[in-house]
Curated annotation (Swiss-Prot):
This is Tol-Pal system protein TolB. One of its GO terms (biological process) is cell division. It comes from Pelagibacter ubique (strain HTCC1062). The gene is tolB. Part of the Tol-Pal system, which plays a role in outer membrane invagination during cell division and is important for maintaining outer membrane integrity. InterPro entries: 6-blade_b-propeller_TolB-like, PD40, Tol-Pal_TolB, TolB_N. Residues 1-19 form the signal peptide. Coiled coil: none annotated. The Tol-Pal system is composed of five core proteins: the inner membrane proteins TolA, TolQ and TolR, the periplasmic protein TolB and the outer membrane protein Pal. They form a network linking the inner and outer membranes and the peptidoglycan layer. The keyword Cell cycle applies. Belongs to the TolB family. PANTHER family: PROTEIN TOLB, PROTEIN TOLB HOMOLOG. It is found in: Periplasm. GO terms for cellular component: periplasmic space.
């Protein structure tokens, strides 16, 4: 799990020519790029060693499956059926017969090799432009064997970046609230998993209600809201050590905690004397600063990536809308003016958009708008859905959605969903239990 155990060793072969392949991710992709992901070749001795350590029959094939599934889930790529491949993995990795790959309509090809070296996992991979008959990229990784799924995610990130021109989002994690039990008596725990739903781990026991977990910029810490003895408090949790602490001792109710981009502060909403305003706390000296001072309800603050601006929602106009202000609370400006109520605004890591939840005529929408309020687009609608969180490249949103219950209160569920920025590729994210309040980490490796 620790990042220091995975290293990119070297670039084997530099890119010598511009490839013909180009994937446009700014529009809904109705024609995903056909890509062949060949099983990574592996010698018999390495196969036996990994089988003993990891209980995996063929680690080369397993890593290629991770890459294939990631590419398919992105909606931008169409991994081809391996049964149609005409060339063996070990041969394809050395020198592909491009005419064979052209026959099955592949435009890009991923090949590679897995070996067991000095008790470590070594993975080499290559990306080929089939149409141009050229190698586009070649990299090698060495890590502990248990990190094999992460290697698959990192390979996907490299392929995604080379073919789209933008960073990927596959070597990431999602923290969320796991939910079990009847709707009126839910057991809620903090849980964390890889972005594809694997390696799920519970971080709390479910003895207290937990809400709104959010990652720190380093991905090591999480801030969240928990009810202890029926009092809501903001907590910090170290994911690696399991240590947690209360962030201050506020006499009122605290809500919606989130880290500043530099990780030095937590911004939150604090209710006192019937009024809710936005505050920050310096995590080093624990000094609390009041950012808004208004008789309305101000909540759900989120920083811009450079830390200079804050977006939040407030009912100061009479009903719930989205506002933007300087990080010191000055120059408050309303930016949402459409019909309905707006909430849970969150700034894109790219800095260009704000995602939000909207309630209008009994339906909930997940949408985006520019930071000045123009260009509002509603991406998806449902009976109930909220709490969008951005992928680190700002191209995908994850949120949660609830189902209706029948007259007996049966049939309730809460699930995580994702959708890309164009409004396409909407899909459910698999979790072990019901799930809500997702937060997407930044990339674990660059």
């Amino acid at each position: 799990m620790l990042l220091r155990y995975l290293f990119i060793l070297f670039i084997i072969i530099p890119i010598k020519a511009f490839a013909l392949i180009e994937v446009d991710i700014t529009r809904g992709n109705l024609n995903p790029l056909p890509v062949a992901v060949s099983p990574l070749s592996i010698d018999n001795k390495s196969k036996e060693n990994f089988k003993k350590i990891l209980k995996q029959e063929d680690l080369g094939s397993e890593i290629s499956i991770v890459v294939e599934n990631n590419l398919r889930q992105s909606g931008l790529f169409n991994p081809l059926d391996k049964n149609a491949f005409l060339q063996e993995p070990d041969v394809a990795n050395l020198k592909p017969r491009f005419e064979d790959w052209n026959l099955i309509k592949a435009q890009a090809l991923v090949t590679g090799k897995v070996t067991f070296v000095d008790e470590k996992l070594r993975v080499e991979f290559r990306l080929w432009d089939v149409l141009a008959g050229k190698e586009m990229m070649a990299l090698a990784f060495t890590t502990v064997p248990s990190n094999w799924r992460r290697v698959g995610h990192i390979i996907t990130d490299k392929v995604y970046e080379r073919l789209t021109g933008e960073k990927g989002y596959f070597d990431t994690r999602i923290i969320y609230v796991s939910e079990e039990g009847p709707k009126t008596k839910r057991i809620k725990k903090l849980a964390i998993m890889d972005q594809d739903g694997f390696n799920n781990k519970y971080l709390t026991l479910g003895n207290e209600l937990v809400l709104t977990p959010r990652f720190s910029p380093t991905n090591q810490m999480v801030t969240y809201l928990s009810y202890f003895r029926n009092l809501p408090r903001v907590y910090l949790l170290d994911i690696e050590t399991g240590m947690q602490e209360v962030v201050g001792d506020f006499p009122g109710m605290t809500f919606a905690p989130r880290f500043s981009p530099d990780g030095k502060k937590i911004i939150m909403s604090f209710a006192k004397d019937g009024n809710s305003d936005i505050y920050t706390m310096d995590l080093e000296n624990r000094i609390v600063e009041r950012i808004t001072n208004h008789p309305s309800i101000d909540t759900s603050p989120s920083y811009s990536p450079d830390g200079k601006k804050i977006t939040f929602n407030s009912d100061r106009s009479g009903y719930q809308q989205i506002y933007v202000m300087d990080s010191n609370g000055k120059n408050v400006k309303r930016i949402s003016f459409g019909n309905g109520l707006y909430g849970t605004p969150v700034w894109s890591p790219r800095g260009d958009l704000i995602a939000f939840t909207k309630l209008h005529k009994g339906k909930f929408y997940i949408g985006v708008m520019r930071t000045d309020g123009t260009g509002e687009r509603l991406l998806t609608e449902n009976f109930y859905q909220e709490a969008p969180s951005w992928s680190p490249n700002g191209r995908v949103l994850i949120f949660y959605r609830e189902t209706k219950t029948n007259s007996k209160g049966e049939g309730f569920s809460a699930k995580l969903w994702s959708i890309d920025l164009t409004g396409y590729n909407e899909k459910m994210v698999e979790t072990e239990t019901d799930a809500s309040d997702p937060s997407w980490s930044s990339l674990l490796s660059n």
